[in-house]
Amino acid sequence: MPRFFTRHAATLFFPMALILYDFAAYLSTDLIQPGIINVVRDFNADVSLAPAAVSLYLAGGMALQWLLGPLSDRIGRRPVLITGALIFTLACAATMFTTSMTQFLIARAIQGTSICFIATVGYVTVQEAFGQTKGIKLMAIITSIVLIAPIIGPLSGAALMHFMHWKVLFAIIAVMGFISFVGLLLAMPETVKRGAVPFSAKSVLRDFRNVFCNRLFLFGAATISLSYIPMMSWVAVSPVILIDAGSLTTSQFAWTQVPVFGAVIVANAIVARFVKDPTEPRFIWRAVPIQLVGLSLLIVGNLLSPHVWLWSVLGTSLYAFGIGLIFPTLFRFTLFSNKLPKGTVSASLNMVILMVMSVSVEIGRWLWFNGGRLPFHLLAVVAGVIVVFTLAGLLNRVRQHQAAELVEEQ
């Protein structure tokens, strides 16, 4: 058994531990959301504080991006990610002992830092530890599994709260976090030479400057962040569109989200199982028409035959399937088609994505309340069309980078 563990630690148990950590981080929001009103009432707090449980979690996710990437480039990936798993576990455990809404929200913000650790350090380690094609396929598998959480989380949370207190849910998540912590401690490989670059403010700023001056990174960051807009604006504003304006029940609304997340899961499963080379430009370009057809349905369907949810869900799901086919490849290209420190590149990319997502959600909300369904969906269409051009720029830069590497090898 020890020999089997040693042989498969990096290839099997490390990805499993990372998946569990990522899954637990998602569940810390998705599992508790159906009962967030109960949380507020338990603390005798104002109901208006309920959304803060999510917003502060996301704020925690943005707080340490600038630090963790450069830090992991210098002291190694292992100590940073393992520390993150421990912090998340302790924050979930601490939630069981909160006695006020303020304490609960502080714990939520600390739990949110898991986004920083996973996205900035964990995903980079996966890409570094495995080859290009295997790394992309493994990330597709991780995404497919983790995205089950937004589907089953709310339904499971609502069911479990009929039998147990909401604090017990955080105890369950804390146990999951602790198991992932132990798994990472035992199985995570180190992919960075420690101490190769000294940690100083000057060197960190220089690395960030070099990243944001790299045109390939800029094309990649623009492509990925704009690709998120159609899905994230829908996820954020759809409760208002479907429940408030469309008069759907919360249960009906939950089921309308399944096709969107399910489409991404299916797309990633196809990449992992059936696509021989997901970096092939012809495969990437074949996914683009699927995205554009989905975006077209958002406008054409609602113009010709308006429906409370059909065209919005169908169009967004089709788009999600198309972009899901190439998301892992886009991340790989953006992170590794340069000679820049990967932790800093990952941190920079995540900061751009989170900023664009935040702005796009606010724009989408404003368009819905001031213009209605069609102007709201037009935001997704505009973003999707721009992506075609930024994707062309990204692939052109990647091709130039690969050609330059071949010349250097010769």
Curated annotation (Swiss-Prot):
Q: Where in the cell is it found?
A: Cell inner membrane
* The name this protein goes by in its record: Multidrug resistance protein MdtM
Query: Does the record bear Transmembrane helix in its keywords?
Result: yes
Effect listed in the UniProt record for changing residue 108 to K: Decreases resistance to ethidium bromide and chloramphenicol. Retains the ability to bind chloramphenicol
The disruption phenotype is: Deletion mutant shows impaired growth in the presence of ethidium bromide and is clearly more susceptible to the effects of chloramphenicol. Growth of the deletion mutant is inhibited above pH 9.25. Deletion of the gene results in a strain that is twofold more susceptible to cholate and fourfold more susceptible to deoxycholate.
Q: Which InterPro entries match?
A: MFS, MFS_dom, MFS_trans_sf, Sugar_transporter_CS
pH behavior: Optimum pH is 9.0 for K(+)/H(+) exchange activity. Optimum pH is 9.25 for Na(+)/H(+) exchange activity.
Q: Which GO terms describe its cellular component?
A: plasma membrane
Species lineage, top-down? Answer: Bacteria, Pseudomonadati, Pseudomonadota, Gammaproteobacteria, Enterobacterales
Q: How is its activity regulated?
A: Efflux is inhibited by the ionophore carbonyl cyanide 3-chlorophenylhydrazone (CCCP).
Would the keyword Transport turn up in this protein's UniProt record?
A: yes
Topology: which residues are Cytoplasmic? 1-11, 70-78, 125-140, 189-216, 273-282, 329-348, 395-410
Report the PROSITE patterns cross-referenced here: MFS
Q: Which residue windows are transmembrane per the record?
A: 12-32, 49-69, 79-99, 104-124, 141-161, 168-188, 217-237, 252-272, 283-303, 308-328, 349-369, 374-394
Role noted for this protein: Proton-dependent efflux pump. Confers resistance to a broad spectrum of chemically unrelated substrates. Overexpression confers resistance to acriflavine, chloramphenicol, norfloxacin, ethidium bromide and tetraphenylphosphonium bromide (TPP). Can also export a broad range of quaternary ammonium compounds (QACs) and contribute to the intrinsic resistance of E.coli to these antimicrobial compounds. In addition to its role in multidrug resistance, MdtM likely plays a physiological role in alkaline pH homeostasis and in resistance to bile salts.
Q: Per UniProt, which keywords does this protein have?
A: Antibiotic resistance, Antiport, Cell inner membrane, Cell membrane, Ion transport, Membrane, Potassium, Potassium transport, Sodium, Sodium transport, Transmembrane, Transmembrane helix, Transport
Q: How does it assemble?
A: Monomer.
PANTHER family from the UniProt entry: MAJOR FACILITATOR SUPERFAMILY (PTHR23502), MULTIDRUG RESISTANCE PROTEIN MDTM (PTHR23502:SF10)
